[in-house]
UniProtKB/Swiss-Prot annotation:
Organism classification: Eukaryota, Metazoa, Chordata, Craniata, Vertebrata
Summary of subunit composition and partner proteins: Monomer. Homodimer. Interacts with PPARG.
Entries under CDD domains matching the protein: FABP4
GO molecular function, one term: long-chain fatty acid binding
Protein name (Swiss-Prot/TrEMBL): Fatty acid-binding protein, adipocyte
Native species: Homo sapiens (Human)
Name of the gene: FABP4
């Protein structure tokens, strides 16, 4: 069910990411460095456990989870959040909650690309990845 996401993906375009990070509460210096990074995303599945790694010159992160089960996550900008990821109509829906706030990250396949849509309040960022 998540096989379409498995593989190594490289960032090829990013829209509105600085505004999204600002809405999340990421500081200026971190936004500038993170905004210039071109991360690779590596997605793998082992039984029920899905792993998403992000590797860049800015920071490397890794989360492993089971669909529908809440887990603790430390984000690339060091927020400590409670995350839940579900599969809804072929879209991986990742909800992060912290300090009474929440953001949603949707990962979906479109043609041969992986499209990541990050939403915080009224701000949306779209980041497009291609197979590496």
């Amino acid at each position: 069910m998540c096989d379409a996401f498995v593989g190594t993906w490289k960032l090829v375009s990013s829209e509105n990411f600085d505004d999204y990070m600002k809405e999340v509460g990421v500081g200026f210096a971190t936004r500038k460095v993170a905004g210039m990074a071109k991360p690779n995303m590596i997605i793998s599945v082992n039984g029920d456990v899905i792993t998403i790694k992000s590797e860049s010159t800015f920071k490397n992160t890794e989360i492993s989870f089971i669909l529908g089960q809440e887990f603790d996550e430390v984000t690339a900008d060091d927020r400590k959040v409670k995350s839940t990821i579900t599969l809804d109509g072929g879209v991986l829906v990742h909800v992060q909650k912290w300090d009474g706030k929440s953001t949603t990250i949707k990962r979906k396949r479109e043609d041969d690309k992986l499209v990541v849509e990050c939403v915080m309040k009224g701000v949306t960022s779209t980041r497009v990845y291609e197979r590496a």
